[in-house]
């Protein structure tokens, strides 16, 4: 598990509220339930956009359930480490990947649906940690998932993939 302190991707390091991390995977940040996030996101600079829902270092004591992200500029939901579970999530027509995790997220994903059009990204982009000495690199449990892509007419050829797994 990542135990250092990091900054949320895209937010300047001078912004203290963008810092996350630590050693408490049981952290409870409250409840996020029955939420629809629509037409969100923002392009801060080249290759630096805001996700529909960013979960950075959020602990397993937090409840995230029945979430919809629709037509976001970048990823629908992205995790940066942490151990929060996300159940009953629908991500549709986003500009990049539907479900994207990085930096050794260690939670549960269950009952997910991704629907992308020809301009969207993959159903999932799943990465572990870039630290070569971190074990396990990534160990979430993901079940009951459906990815529906844009088909063979996607604008970006690599977006034909339902899922990309690295690290």
Residue ranges and their predicted role:
Residues 1-167:
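Beta-strand/loop edge motif enriched in small/polar residues
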């Amino acid at each position: 598990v990542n135990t250092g302190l990091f900054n949320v991707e895209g937010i300047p390091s001078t912004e203290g509220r963008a810092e996350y991390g630590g050693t408490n995977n049981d952290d409870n940040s409250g409840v996020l339930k029955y939420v629809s996030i629509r037409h969100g996101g923002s392009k801060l600079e080249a290759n630096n956009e805001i996700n529909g829902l960013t979960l950075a270092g959020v602990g397993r004591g937090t409840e995230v359930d029945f979430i919809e992200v629709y037509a976001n500029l970048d990823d629908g939901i992205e995790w940066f480490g942490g151990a929060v579970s996300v159940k009953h999530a629908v991500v549709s027509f986003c500009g990049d990947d539907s479900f994207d995790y990085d930096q050794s997220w260690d939670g549960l994903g269950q009952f997910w649906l991704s629907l992308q059009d020809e301009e969207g990204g993959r159903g999932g982009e799943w990465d572990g940690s870039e630290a070569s000495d971190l074990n396990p690199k990534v160990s979430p449990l993901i079940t009951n998932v459906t990815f529906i892509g844009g088909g063979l007419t996607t604008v970006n050829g690599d977006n034909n993939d339902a899922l990309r797994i690295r690290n």
